[in-house]
């Protein structure tokens, strides 16, 4: 591991996974602009379901299923009392492991697919995380919604999915 932050995050996830359950590699990223390469710790939490994160010098990028989140403080520093990027990333990961994550895919017409994610709390309320639009090329227009829910299975040490 290059960064101590990686160990800090793994310690926070220890109720769910141990270091033996994950794959950790040091990554070197060559940048297109010719500047010095960036180095990161890549930690694969659930390879089958594309759940992993990478820690850089001042940023954490978290990938989950078909989406991802960036956590950093260089765009805007946290105000007094606000959590820093490490705390925000750790909180997100802990919620990913303890709450259900709902994925809603909506096809409208023949050329657009919208994908949205939301954390679902025990009381049924949800926190919208964001969404993306993808270009598709269907021959026939259609209106379709597919909802699936992801939840961490502690016994199997991986995420499982159910489609509604």
Model feature map: region roles:
Residues 1-5, 9, 81-88:
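Short amphipathic alpha-helical segments
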Residues 2-23:
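Amphipathic alpha-helical segments
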Residues 94, 98-164:
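Acidic, proline/glycine-rich low-complexity IDRs
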